[in-house]
From Swiss-Prot:
This is Pyrimidine/purine nucleoside phosphorylase. Its EC number is 2.4.2.1, 2.4.2.2. SUPFAM superfamilies: RmlC-like cupins. The keyword Glycosyltransferase applies. GO terms for cellular component: cytosol. It comes from Escherichia coli (strain K12). Disruption phenotype: Cells lacking this gene show a consistent change in xanthine level. PANTHER family: PYRIMIDINE/PURINE NUCLEOSIDE PHOSPHORYLASE (PTHR36540), PYRIMIDINE_PURINE NUCLEOSIDE PHOSPHORYLASE (PTHR36540:SF1). It catalyses: a purine D-ribonucleoside + phosphate = a purine nucleobase + alpha-D-ribose 1-phosphate; adenosine + phosphate = alpha-D-ribose 1-phosphate + adenine; cytidine + phosphate = cytosine + alpha-D-ribose 1-phosphate; guanosine + phosphate = alpha-D-ribose 1-phosphate + guanine. The keyword Glycosyltransferase applies.
Amino acid sequence: MLQSNEYFSGKVKSIGFSSSSTGRASVGVMVEGEYTFSTAEPEEMTVISGALNVLLPDATDWQVYEAGSVFNVPGHSEFHLQVAEPTSYLCRYL
């Protein structure tokens, strides 16, 4: 079953799903802006198109992840994103 989600006044939209190959996940798009997300469980983020400038928990430096890049976020934490162009992503809940 698909679940639509909308965050930050519609600037981030995702569709949640579950499959045997991916597990529980969501795929979405973010438009330009700065966002802070909280995690309940560990997440694996894959940038599909565009790029994300990311400040991970306990990090002091921002890091750019471009299309095809993957980064992991611990559970029960916050991470910050800067988005300069519309960017699509896949988020797997681990």
